[in-house]
From Swiss-Prot:
It is found in: Membrane. Expressed in roots and siliques. It comes from the Eukaryota. It comes from Arabidopsis thaliana. The gene is NPF5.3. The chain crosses the membrane at residues 77-97, 100-120, 141-161, 189-209, 217-237, 334-354, 370-390, 408-428, 449-469, 492-512, 538-558. SUPFAM superfamilies: MFS general substrate transporter (SSF103473). Keywords: Membrane, Transmembrane, Transmembrane helix. One of its GO terms (cellular component) is membrane. This is Protein NRT1/ PTR FAMILY 5.3.
Length: 586
């Protein structure tokens, strides 16, 4: 290889190896590195969902908690698991970098899994068995037992805070934005990334859930812990192939400096003279393997932060690039806001959908019954199939019509998922009304121990459609917040996805408790320990209306959203969302 060829072979996006040396495209990154990341994700998701999928059943049957309490404990924990990535993203971007942050967090994650396995294995760490079907008459878990169990759960949540925002970003970093082939592969990466997630989830919601229900919780959780250990081992094997981006300082501090500087100069008159705005020389960016961003007209108030007024203090004067990076993170906030309600939908399939399944006939044969949480496997399978069809058929077809490399825009993809969410909750409400009717006809309204003579597969449509919806909205969320974040804030951008999930789960807890308390005062509560006496059909229809209102707000938000400028100049910059509202009105 000639000197010129060696020079051309180096990546141009600033990626380095662990020692800080430039890396070659031919020797690092791309799919040969991503294969380790993808395999890691399969086993890690198997481990995580091996715990979370059946958690509401464990809390009900083993810790003897009621419907609302167990559901809220699950959603609060899952919400925390999605909230801690904000801290993980900060540590990665400001201090240790993604790789080191990920490795340290993985050790904490594994510790939490091991402690959780012990808590479900040792008899002294859980309350005695209860023979009655009414959990209100069972002995509750002691303070120490709850402390060990939830301590392990939240240790696990802290660990995931450093893995979730960084692992997908590490994977995306393996593709050089300045190489046309790499850029095309990155578009497919997020689809196959989600494919790996749901492949692991499918195994967890079928095999591991069955083991927990029929063999033992200790063995089921033990297998999850071994799966996590194996996933970390696989990730470390690929270390020499990974490309790394250097930490570029705290994004929170940078954003705070821009906002403070602009407020301090609020009374300063704006200037049309570009020389009055501060920016670093291009060579200084080149030395850091970074790129300047040109000034834009959006959120013009923040431009004052880069206006030269005499003081050069960093809290009074920022670069144009820092201002534009802050603008971009702020411009994504309205989009983030309208993803909260869709995230609440995921909380329903992890809690109330599963509790519904416990009331139905779960027998496949005389000797085999399907665990209620295993219906999540159909959601996963539906999403796996949908992703493949979307990536291999839908994108190619739509690309010819729209000229967009992705087929349709990311926000259009989100919108389709939101429409499906409305349909899902309408179907769920109708199905639940039918379930209550069958229970009443067989005199089972006040019974909890006897299953309703109605197959658990009656719930299948809502599970399958949820997988289809996730193939649109969840992948679009992940890719949108990564793609639209500035280069120096990619981990923070990815953590927007985690924030969406966290807020959605916490909102679900608040909503469930509020609706339960309010409807109790009106007479028959919508959510009770005995679901046959509840009115989940009303609750689900309320969700359908909530999703409809959120979708209308979504259309307003995207009408005014402008995509960020692409520093590689390989795509149109500052392009408005093309006629999505018009498309929906046609």
């Amino acid at each position: 290889m000639t000197v010129e060829e060696v020079g051309d072979d180096y990546t141009k996006d600033g990626t380095v190896d662990l020692r800080g040396n430039r890396v070659r495209r031919s020797q690092t990154g791309r799919w040969k590195a991503c294969s380790f990341v993808v395999v890691y994700e399969v086993f890690e998701r198997m481990a995580y969902y091996g715990i979370s999928s059946n958690l509401v059943i464990y809390m009900t049957t083993k810790l003897h908690q009621g419907t609302v309490k167990s559901s809220n404990n699950v959603t609060n924990w899952v919400g925390t698991s999605w909230l801690t990535p904000i801290l993980g993203a900060y540590v990665a971007d400001a201090h240790f970098g993604r790789y080191i942050t990920f490795v340290i967090s993985s050790a904490i994650y594994l510790l939490g899994m091991a402690l959780l396995t012990l808590s479900v294995s040792l008899p002294g760490l859980k309350p005695p068995k209860c023979s009655t079907a009414n959990v209100e008459n069972c002995e509750k878990a002691s303070v120490i037992q709850l402390a060990v169990f939830f301590g392990a759960l939240y240790t696990l949540a802290i660990g995931t805070g450093g893995t979730k925002p960084n692992i997908s970003t590490i994977g995306a970093d393996q593709f050089d934005e300045f190489d046309p082939k790499d850029k095309i592969h990155k578009h497919s990466f997020f689809n196959w990334w989600m494919f790996s997630i749901f492949f692991g989830t499918f195994f967890a919601t079928t095999v591991l859930v069955y083991v927990q229900d029929n063999v033992g919780w200790a063995i089921g959780y033990g297998l999850s812990t071994l799966g996590l250990a194996f996933s970390i081992f696989i990730f470390l094997l690929g270390t020499r192939l990974y490309r790394h981006k250097l930490p570029m300082g705290s994004p929170f501090t940078k954003m705070a400096r821009v906002i403070v500087a602009s407020l301090r100069k609020a009374r300063e008159p704006m200037s049309s003279d570009s020389t009055r705005f501060y920016e670093l020389p291009p060579m200084e960016y080149a030395s850091k393997r970074a790129f300047p961003i040109h000034s834009t007209s959006s959120l013009r108030f923040l431009n004052r932060a880069s206006l030269k007024t005499g003081s050069t203090h960093k809290w009074r004067l920022c670069t144009i690039t820092e201002v534009e990076e802050t603008k971009q993170m702020l411009k994504m906030l309205p989009v983030l806001f309208v993803t909260f309600v869709p995230s609440m939908m995921l909380a329903q399939i992890m809690t109330l959908f599963i509790k519904q399944g416990t009331t139905l006939d779960r027998r496949l044969t005389n000797n085999f019954s399907i665990p209620p949480a295993s219906l999540l496997g159909f959601t996963t399978f539906s999403m796996l199939v949908s992703i493949v069809i979307y990536d291999r058929v839908f994108v190619k077809f739509m690309r010819k019509l729209t000229g967009n490399p992705r087929g349709i825009t990311l926000l259009q993809r989100m919108g389709i998922g939101m429409i499906l969410h409305i349909l899902i909750m309408i179907i769920a409400s109708i199905t639940e009304r039918y379930r209550l009717k069958v229970a009443a006809e067989h005199g089972l309204t006040h019974q909890t121990a006897v299953p309703i003579p109605l197959s658990i597969f009656t719930l299948l449509p809502q599970y399958v459609l949820m997988g289809l919806a996730d193939a649109f909205i969840e992948i679009a969320k992940l890719e949108f917040f990564y793609d639209q974040a500035p280069e120096s804030m990619k981990s923070l951008g990815t953590s927007y996805t985690s924030t969406s999930m966290a807020v959605g789960y916490f909102m679900s807890s608040i909503l469930l408790s509020s609706v339960s308390q309010i409807t109790k005062k009106q007479g028959r509560g919508w959510i009770q320990n005995n679901l046959n006496e509840s009115r989940l059909d009303n609750y689900y229809m309320f969700f359908a209306v909530l999703n409809l209102l959120n979708f209308i707000l979504f259309l307003v938000v995207i009408r005014f959203y402008e995509y960020r400028a692409d520093v590689t100049q390989s795509a149109n910059v500052e392009q408005k969302e093309p006629n999505m509202v018009d498309n929906y009105n046609e």
